[in-house]
Amino acid sequence: MIRVAVTGACGRMGSGIIRRVLEEEDMELVAAIEAPGTPLRGRDIGEFTGRGSVGVEVTDASNLADTLAETEPDVLVDFTVASAAVETIKTSTEAGVNLVVGTTGFSEEEMQTVRDCIERSGVRAVIAPNMAVGVNVFFKVLRDLAPILSDYDVEIIEAHHRHKKDAPSGTAVRALEVISEATGRRASEVAVHGRSGLTGERSRDEIGVHAVRGGDIVGDHIVLFAGDGERLEIVHRAHSRDAFIGGVIRAIRFIEDAEPGRIMDMGDVLGIN
C-alpha cells in the first residue's frame, strides 16, 4: 500500500488527485494539506471532495513537519504555487519523503534550491510541468521533429482558463526548452514573449511564446513550425483534468523505481526518454 500525502488538497488539481487516490486499491490517503490559515483546517477532506467521511482531516502547511512525522507518507504530491512548493520540498526532503511535483512557475534560483534538496537528501522525485500522458508524447514528438525542421520558424501558443496564475504555462516553457535543446539553442536567448509595435523582421533563431487566458479552458498547446509554402502544427488539448490526474497516479506508482537523489520526469515514468 502506497501512503500518499497531498498539498494543495482543496485546489482544482489537489482535490481531483485525492478523489482518485481514494479509489485506488494500492494507495492510502494519509494527509491532506492546505495553505497556512486555511478555514478548512480540521474538516474531513472526504466531505470537501464529495466522498463523505474518509477519516483524513485537512491540516495546515505551517505544521507540515509534524504532519509528515505523524502520518509517515511514502510520497507527497504537490500542486500548489512555486514559492509554497519550495518550502514544502525543503521540509519533505528533510523528512525523507519522496515527491511527485506538478507545480509550475519556479524561477531558476528556486529550481536550483529544489535540485539541491533532492540531491542532498537522496529522496526519489518526479517533477513535471504537465503529467498528462499525451503531453509527454507531445514533447517527444517535438524533440524528434525539431532537428528535421530546424530551418522553420517556431511559435508556441498556449491557452488556459482565466484563473491560471502563471504565464506562460510550464508546459509551454518545457516545449520551448525541448525544441531549443534539440536544435542547439539556448531557450533564454531565443524566446520572444509576445510581440507589439514595430518589432522588425523576425530573426531565424527566435521562438515566439504566447499565452492566452480566458473562460474555463483546461489547457491547449500548439507548436507551429512555419516554412516557405507550408506549415506544420503539433497540438495537444486537454479536455479535463482527468488527463493530468491519470499521469499523477502513474508517477506515484513509479516513484519507488525512480533513481534516488535525482529529479526524474514523466518521460522517465513512461519510458520514452
Swiss-Prot record:
Q: What is any one of the record's Gene Ontology cellular component terms?
A: cytoplasm
> What is the organism of origin for this protein?
Methanothermobacter thermautotrophicus (strain ATCC 29096 / DSM 1053 / JCM 10044 / NBRC 100330 / Delta H)
The record's annotation in Pfam families points to: DapB_C, DapB_N
The record lists (S)-2,3,4,5-tetrahydrodipicolinate as bound by 161, 170-171
Gene Ontology molecular functions = 4-hydroxy-tetrahydrodipicolinate reductase; NAD binding; NADP binding; oxidoreductase activity, acting on CH or CH2 groups, NAD or NADP as acceptor
Q: What is this protein called?
A: 4-hydroxy-tetrahydrodipicolinate reductase
**Active-site residues?**
160, 164
Protein task: Catalyzes the conversion of 4-hydroxy-tetrahydrodipicolinate (HTPA) to tetrahydrodipicolinate.
Q: Which PANTHER family match?
A: 4-HYDROXY-TETRAHYDRODIPICOLINATE REDUCTASE 1, CHLOROPLASTIC-RELATED, DIHYDRODIPICOLINATE REDUCTASE
